[in-house]
Amino acid sequence: MERSALSFWVRSPGKGEIERVALPDPGPDDVVVRTLYSGISRGTESLVFEGRVPAGQRDLMRAPFQEGDFPGPVKYGYLNVGIVEEGASALVGRTVFCLYPHQTRYVVPASAVTPVPEDVPPGRAILAGTVETAVNALWDAAPLVGDRIAVVGAGMVGCSVAAVLAGLPGARVQLVDVDTSRAPVAEALGVGFAVPDDAEGDCDLVVHASASEAGLARSLELLAPEGEVLELSWYGDRRVAVPLGEHFHSRRLTVRGSQVGAVSPSRRSRRTHADRLALALRLLAAPAFDALITGEAGFTELPRLMPPLASGALPALCHRIVYDPVEEAALVQRHRP
């Protein structure tokens, strides 16, 4: 009997569809996973949905289980939580996280899934990929006890960084964003909040994640002498001016890039990608992370949901996608050739 599933594809910039796909038979080292939830990483997936991945960055932007190529047709995504239905006996029945796109079922090597700890709800575990980005960023930044820190940009990545920093003893952590509706999120995470003009300065470290030229300029202004901006923003195909005049050199400021594709050099010889992801999942035992999930919709709603999410008409941090097995079975029958 042929195995099949339904997946979400970006057919062309700004247009998404749900398609039936055939699944391969699992090999001896594979698992079959039924998806419970997936998450839309709004910043990155908006770039993909709108066809704004720069030609020179397309190889770097590929997701681990992406199919197709930019700008489309392409199946993209990397925040997926499901239950193992077939495979190694130690994994069958376990809830797992995988860097897989939006699809109802899939077959992957067992090494590609990470068990979700029992004290982490499956619906929260979709944040693991973004919290992993935060972990890697803070391995890069290496903040110290008592540091004065600002996180500029209260999107999904910025909020994840702030959530992890909230546990740093003696630190002053402030989330900075032009959108005052992010203030309750900051409160839930246990950090301060300010609009850019009111942000506290004299920072040892500023993590910039707003993907805006104004945000980067303000990040530099908030630094103390010899402070550092850690740049986490992904600008896609936009060119951004960096204000290196005025006091940049005399104050000996630093702007450093960080990217989750490789483990931070500070840990690379001692931690693997799997170690980093497992740590992110353990951190998600904290209920405060629920504040990052700001919306929910069914899988079949993805084609109509992505345009307003990508344009910003529907504000969101992480939008959670829910998979209904009964609905899936009916849709698979409907999509049969």
Locations of regions flagged by a protein language model:
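C-terminal hydrophobic helical "lid"/dimerization subdomain
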Residues: R3, R271-P337
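Glycine-rich beta-strand-centered segment in the early N-terminal region that forms part
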Residues: P24-I40, V48-Y100
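A structural motif shared across PLP-dependent enzymes of the aminotransferase-like
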Residues: F97-A110
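Mid-domain Rossmann-like dinucleotide-binding core that forms the NAD(H)/NADP(H) cofactor-binding site
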Residues: P121-P196
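A generic alpha-to-beta junction signature in SAM-dependent methyltransferases
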Residues: A142-P143, L223-A224, A313
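Helix N-cap at the beta1-alpha1 junction of Rossmann-like dinucleotide-binding domains, i.e.
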Residues: T180-R182, E213, G236
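A short acidic, Gly/Pro-enriched loop at the edge of an enzyme's catalytic core
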Residues: A199-V206
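Glycine-rich phosphate-binding loop and adjacent beta-alpha segment
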Residues: A217-R282, Y323-P337
